[in-house]
């Protein structure tokens, strides 16, 4: 658990804070999209959000040591939501 506390925002939570809990996916449940699996490797900061037609573009400032894992057309997850990477800069 020390690694979870170090790599997530759980250390910032206090008693009474609201958190997102989701029901377990059952095998017979339908999916709208795809399953996100993986491990938390770090915390990014949402630097900017803007609308581009029907799309929402989210700019995430990412720790430098994680940037080598962020690939154009790859994916990241924010709060369990899978997002496609459309542009990669030095730190976003």
Region annotations inferred by a language model:
Residues 1-92:
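Conserved loop->alpha-helix
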């Amino acid at each position: 658990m020390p690694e979870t506390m170090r790599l997530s925002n759980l250390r910032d939570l206090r008693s009474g804070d609201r958190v997102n809990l989701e029901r377990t996916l059952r095998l017979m449940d339908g999916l709208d999209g795809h399953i996100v699996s993986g491990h938390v490797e770090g915390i990014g900061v949402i630097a900017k959000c803007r609308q581009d037609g029907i799309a929402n573009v989210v700019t995430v400032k990412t720790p430098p040591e994680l940037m080598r894992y962020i690939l154009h057309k790859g994916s990241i997850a924010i709060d369990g939501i899978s997002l496609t990477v459309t542009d990669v800069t030095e730190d976003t």
